[in-house]
């Protein structure tokens, strides 16, 4: 089996490494020559994962046509804000009747489209039943280190979901399939917003009680907006919901938690983002999530406060204080 991976960031590279480790021939699309040369000559992604050796069956190319055309499966892993442009570039080369797996997470700024909505609007209908979405608690470095990991595979088409599940599942990588595309996407996107808040709490020196409170109430917000969009509430108790939320809020490898932590320590957002080599999806997703909650008429207190901190300059300590001063409520999810 020949597989093309679009996106040479840490997660796209990790998925490519997993698939190559299973024995598949994997070609990774990179935008710069030094990265291509480093992967092909030294089996190292010098830009994103310089300390890890990649399998020999993973090669790289700058030629998008070469990466996509004639492949038996396509894995798409660009940042969500770049997804529309990438899909427009690849669709003339995209093979028909092969699985297309998205690992992008986020909600598009301006349009407020989920990743699945971007795929379905940018690609012709003949591709739609072959689309699937991968999400779950999975740091890239730990996948490459072969640490046992579980994720969700969501597709509206059961045949596609089961095929992708079989292709990805391996000794250290277990997948669970679900038809709930919306639930998997909402969980994978909004957990990054909550992780920003958890990072701020840690940066300010608050304890684990506070982090647990943010995770708990964050799951409430994720579930509320998911239900409004038609998701199955049980999805949010699975790998792409609670699993990913816990990892992203607690793990030191989490880029979004790191951004929040540094904000809590007093750095500006501009300083933080300019120093990062990878995209922290939560920053852009916060804006979209805030606008979506306003559009749907859903109260999302944590999301609103993170938005004010990122885009209106609100002091991080005031964010936590105002969350604690909110009107008292009954426990539960109400939409």
Swiss-Prot record:
**Which GO terms of the cellular component aspect does the record hold?**
cytosol
The EC number of this protein is: 1.1.1.94
Which GO molecular function entries does the Swiss-Prot or TrEMBL record give?
A: glycerol-3-phosphate dehydrogenase [NAD(P)+] activity; NAD binding
Family statement = Belongs to the NAD-dependent glycerol-3-phosphate dehydrogenase family.
Q: Per UniProt, where does sn-glycerol 3-phosphate bind?
A: 105, 136, 138, 191, 244, 254-256
SUPFAM superfamilies from the UniProt entry? 6-phosphogluconate dehydrogenase C-terminal domain-like, NAD(P)-binding Rossmann-fold domains
**Chain's role:** Catalyzes the reduction of the glycolytic intermediate dihydroxyacetone phosphate (DHAP) to sn-glycerol 3-phosphate (G3P), the key precursor for phospholipid synthesis.
Pfam families per the UniProt record, alphabetical: NAD_Gly3P_dh_C, NAD_Gly3P_dh_N
Identify the keywords attached in UniProt to this record, alphabetized: Cytoplasm, Lipid biosynthesis, Lipid metabolism, NAD, NADP, Nucleotide-binding, Oxidoreductase, Phospholipid biosynthesis, Phospholipid metabolism
Q: Does the keyword DNA repair apply?
A: no
Is Lipid biosynthesis set as a keyword in this record?
yes
Q: Mind telling me what this protein is named? A: Glycerol-3-phosphate dehydrogenase [NAD(P)+]
The catalysed reaction is: sn-glycerol 3-phosphate + NAD(+) = dihydroxyacetone phosphate + NADH + H(+); sn-glycerol 3-phosphate + NADP(+) = dihydroxyacetone phosphate + NADPH + H(+)
NCBIfam families xrefs: PRK00094.1-2, PRK00094.1-3, PRK00094.1-4
The primary site where this protein sits is cytoplasm
Q: Which residues bind NADPH?
A: 10-11, 31, 105, 140, 255, 279, 281
Q: In which pathway does it act?
A: Membrane lipid metabolism; glycerophospholipid metabolism
Q: Which GO terms describe its biological process?
A: carbohydrate metabolic process; glycerol-3-phosphate biosynthetic process; glycerol-3-phosphate catabolic process; glycerophospholipid metabolic process; phospholipid biosynthetic process
Active site per database record? 191 (proton acceptor)
């Amino acid at each position: 089996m020949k597989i093309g991976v679009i996106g040479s960031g840490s997660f796209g590279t990790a998925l490519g490494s997993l698939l190559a480790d299973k024995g598949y021939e994997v070609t990774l699309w990179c935008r710069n020559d030094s990265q291509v040369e480093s992967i092909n000559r030294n089996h190292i992604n010098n830009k994103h994962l310089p300390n890890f050796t990649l399998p020999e069956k993973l090669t790289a190319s700058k030629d998008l046509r070469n990466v996509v055309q004639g492949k038996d499966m396509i894995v798409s892993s660009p940042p969500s804000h770049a997804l529309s442009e990438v899909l427009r570039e690849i669709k003339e080369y995209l093979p028909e009747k092969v699985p297309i797996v998205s690992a992008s997470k986020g909600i598009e700024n301006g349009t407020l489209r989920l990743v699945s909505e971007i795929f379905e609007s940018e690609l012709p209908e003949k591709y739609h039943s072959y689309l699937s979405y991968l999400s779950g608690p999975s740091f890239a470095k730990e996948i490459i280190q072969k640490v046992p990991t579980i994720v969700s595979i969501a597709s509206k088409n059961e045949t596609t979901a089961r095929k992708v599940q079989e292709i990805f599942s391996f000794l250290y990588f277990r997948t669970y399939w679900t038809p709930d595309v919306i639930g998997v996407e909402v969980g994978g996107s909004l957990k990054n917003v909550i992780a920003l808040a958890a990072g701020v709490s840690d940066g300010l020196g608050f304890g684990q009680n506070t982090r647990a409170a943010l995770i708990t109430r964050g799951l409430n917000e994720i579930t509320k907006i998911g239900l409004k969009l038609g998701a199955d509430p049980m999805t949010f108790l699975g790998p792409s919901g609670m699993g990913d939320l816990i990892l992203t809020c607690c793990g030191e490898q989490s880029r979004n938690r790191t951004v929040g932590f540094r904000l809590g320590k007093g750095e500006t957002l501009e300083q933080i983002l300019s120093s990062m080599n990878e995209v922290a999806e939560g920053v852009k997703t916060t804006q979209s999530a805030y606008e979506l909650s306003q559009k749907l008429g859903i109260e999302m207190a944590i999301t609103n406060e993170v938005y004010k901190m990122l885009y209106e300059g609100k002091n991080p300590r005031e964010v936590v204080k105002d969350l604690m001063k909110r009107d008292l409520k009954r426990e539960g999810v109400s939409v």
